[in-house]
């Protein structure tokens, strides 16, 4: 909230329809300190709100304002490290398969035996939709580049992997390129970078085969910039997950978008309604003006007052032992989270 408040004076009194220009004003304002951390999140939040307002002023859905031909984007399912049991994991992917989703992503990295078993559970759940479902793995920068080559090659003896996500550090374009050239799966990365400047080395150095894009790339405007640059290099993009799939309108408008990450419903507790649903494996958007999301401020205040008994995981530290080669699983540690 403080970061958002610090940017209000930059755009106050200006025409909200000039979203791209207002985005540049905000990015230029934080030039010296750089577009990082809470400031990046604030710029992203304001940018999304401005795009929502621009579409509402035009009395049309945001996907149309952004230039999409139709209001839909292909979906894939992701467990995003919810620490599900084998049975819960199968139930989750099976529910997504029931609405036509034909691929999924799962966390890997700590234990090959568990990884292989759980990839199999994911594959079996999606086989009700497709005999060869799209299977993605995400090691969240836990492995070194050489470890990734070793482990991904082993996984590929058992499964056809569509892409391997973050198999090296986000900024290590040499390592990512090394992995890409030594495994069959496509290499995806970029979700933890902030803007087009940080993404450029990965793209220009042919370090990634697929780019993760999302609201974290400085909002809709920044994510579209990254995606357009990827288009020039024939690199497809995949949209990251977000509550109520609010980035789906941009995904629908990108000519090089392949699939958007979706998670099990339940993170929309602050919304009264949202104008999209999953059907036949696609996020289908309606025609309500703007994002089509109704936010309930009272629900937000009520959620802020809840004591969950623990602090949230943010800022999501890197797991102990990453890239050290010697980390064993501790007693009681969940080996797939």
Give the label of every model feature segment.
Residues 242-337:
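Flexible C-terminal active-site loop/helix
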Residues 58-81:
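N-terminal small/glycine-rich loop or linker at the start of catalytic domains
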Residues 95-107:
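Catalytic domains of carbohydrate-active enzymes, especially glycoside hydrolases
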Residues 1-57, 330, 334-337:
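Metal- or metallocofactor-binding catalytic centers and their adjacent structured scaffolds
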Residues 13, 60, 185, 235, ...:
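Short glycine/serine/threonine/alanine-rich loop segments
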Residues 7, 46, 59, 122, ...:
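Conserved, mostly hydrophobic/aromatic
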Residues 106-241:
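Catalytic core of soluble alpha/beta enzymes
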């Amino acid at each position: 909230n403080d970061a958002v408040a610090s940017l209000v004076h930059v755009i106050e009194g200006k025409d909200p329809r000039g979203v791209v220009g207002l985005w540049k004003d905000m990015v230029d304002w934080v030039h010296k300190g750089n577009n990082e951390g809470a400031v990046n999140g604030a710029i992203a939040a304001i940018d999304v709100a401005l795009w929502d307002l621009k579409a509402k002023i035009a009395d049309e859905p945001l996907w149309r304002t952004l230039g999409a031909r139709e209001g839909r984007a292909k979906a894939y399912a992701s467990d995003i490290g919810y620490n599900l049991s084998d049975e819960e994991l199968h139930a989750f992917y099976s529910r997504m398969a029931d609405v036509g989703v034909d691929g999924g992503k799962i966390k890997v990295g700590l234990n090959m035996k568990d990884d292989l078993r759980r990839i199999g559970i994911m594959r079996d759940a999606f086989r009700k939709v497709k005999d060869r479902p799209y299977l993605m793995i995400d090691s969240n920068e836990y492995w070194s580049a050489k470890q990734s080559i070793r482990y991904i090659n082993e996984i590929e003896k058992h499964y056809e992997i569509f892409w391997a996500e973050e198999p090296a550090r986000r900024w290590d374009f040499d390592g990512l390129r090394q992995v890409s050239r030594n495994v069959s799966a496509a290499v995806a990365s970029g979700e933890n970078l902030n803007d087009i400047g940080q993404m450029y080395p990965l793209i220009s150095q042919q370090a990634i085969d697929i780019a993760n894009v999302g609201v974290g790339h400085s909002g809709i405007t920044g994510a579209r910039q990254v995606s357009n640059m990827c288009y020039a290099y024939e690199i497809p993009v995949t949209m990251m997950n977000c509550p109520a799939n609010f980035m789906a309108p941009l995904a629908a408008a990108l000519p090089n978008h392949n699939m958007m990450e979706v998670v099990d419903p339940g993170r929309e507790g602050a919304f009264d309604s949202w104008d999209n649903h999953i059907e036949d494996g696609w996020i289908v958007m309606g025609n309500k003006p703007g994002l089509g999301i109704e936010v309930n401020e009272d629900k937000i205040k009520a959620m802020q007052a809840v004591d969950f008994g623990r602090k949230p995981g943010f800022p999501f530290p890197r797991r102990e032992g990453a890239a050290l080669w010697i980390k064993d699983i501790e007693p009681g540690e969940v080996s797939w989270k």
